[in-house]
Amino acid sequence: GTRAHNRWRVHQTVSVVCPKEANAEALKILNAGVDSLGFCIASEAFTAADLDTLLGEICIPAVQLTFCGQKTADVAELVLAKIEKEGIAKEDVRIAFCIDPLVKGLSTKGDFCSPNGEKCFARIAELIRKTKEYKHIRVVTVSGQIFGNSGSTIVEELAFVLSAGHDYLVRLMDAGLTIEEAARKLRFSFSVSSNYFMEIAKFRAARMLWANIVKGYNPEKNCACKMQIHAETSKWNQTVYDPYVNMLRGTTEAMSAALGGVYSLEVTPFDASFENPTEFSKRIARNVELLLKHESHFDQVVDPAGGSYYIENLTQSIAAEAWKLFLEIEEKGGYTEAYKAGFIAERIKASAAAKDKNIATRRQILLGANQYPNFTEVAGKEITAESVTRKQAEGNVLVPYRGAMAFEEMRLHVDRSGKEPKAFMLTCGNLGMARARSQFSCNFFACAGIKVIDN
């Protein structure tokens, strides 16, 4: 590549219920090392005055901004009007809008906002034309983390993201845009699981495959083939019991994303699965990235995995399998048609079921949930039945969940019962063999909150 470094942007999302409070939080985290701000708009009645309050004292050219949540297209219009009003140089504006009717709309709601999404894509094409001179504004974000957090495999997540991205290209070119105009306005968001080397390879394969897709349309400039990747550490493998282990998961996942060469990264706070993240958890999440940058110097080496036989081979293997699945989706008419036919949702549900079985049989380990639980831990009041109960999908939609939920639901039921079930460990025979079985049994019962009395 042409990069002389491996710098990424430290991203953190602020929930915007009250613009004034959100602005105060944003200013605080900007002074704590964040250089990529996400704003999740909670109200559909968000106004220009609200935007002025939200961005008060924030130097727009100095930070990457991302807007998601309610009425993102309307928010985009407000943001563009503000930029023009303030006369900010177009090359200094770095903003992404999480407009995503294909994945966030179709895949999680089951349908578009209009028949076949015509109004959605016409609006997107209009915004792209308005931002044509803004080189660093991305209008569409392909929300691939939804696949990973719903239980897909790494190959499936990559293939479905590429397929959705290609569908955007086709629809936007049908709306009169060139390949360069469409491709430069796309941004891709992925989840990052604990599968360390596989995740590094996934990001490397993603850039390679996306470049192949865009090159197929013969763009005038190769820069249109570049893929801007945002990564979020996984929510699927987080646990509500022994939650501090989530810090360790977030650290290895952040390392994978950094070594994989992402543009921006958000580490999920360790308590996000059972409460609104605290100031402490959000600070730790930021500091994971800052430590990787300033103490481990992960931002100083370009593609450190390059030349590694294992990772290079893994990259090629993932790319080959993802491309095979991508072509299968294309044969079905592309992402939209394949999704409406149930192919994508059923494929993810099958992968999720296989993962659930592996967790249930401890072929896949989730520390603190199905292996090595904290024997003395009792669920706090912040852990509710809702936080450990998996929502059932209705129809052809994707519903994110966490892999540990089945174990956690069982253990929470025991914790809330007011009783302390006990199991007496009666060991006999050879001491070494008995001890091994005793340790296994202690772990087994503790996963359900059953106290073991060892003789």
PLM segments and residue spans:
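Short glycine/threonine-rich loop-to-helix capping motif typified by GTGT followed
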Residues: 152-158, 193-205, 234-247, 275-285, ...
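Glycine-rich anion/phosphate-binding loop at the beta-strand->alpha-helix junction
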Residues: 189-285
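Intrinsic disorder at enzyme termini
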Residues: 1, 263, 321-423
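Inter-helical turn/loop segments and adjacent helix faces that build the functional surface
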Residues: 86, 175-180, 214-221, 299-303, ...
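Catalytic alpha/beta active-site cores
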Residues: 1-195, 217, 226-230, 258, ...
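A glycine-rich phosphate-binding loop feature that marks nucleotide/adenosyl-phosphate handling sites
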Residues: 98-102, 142-149, 182-193, 224-236, ...
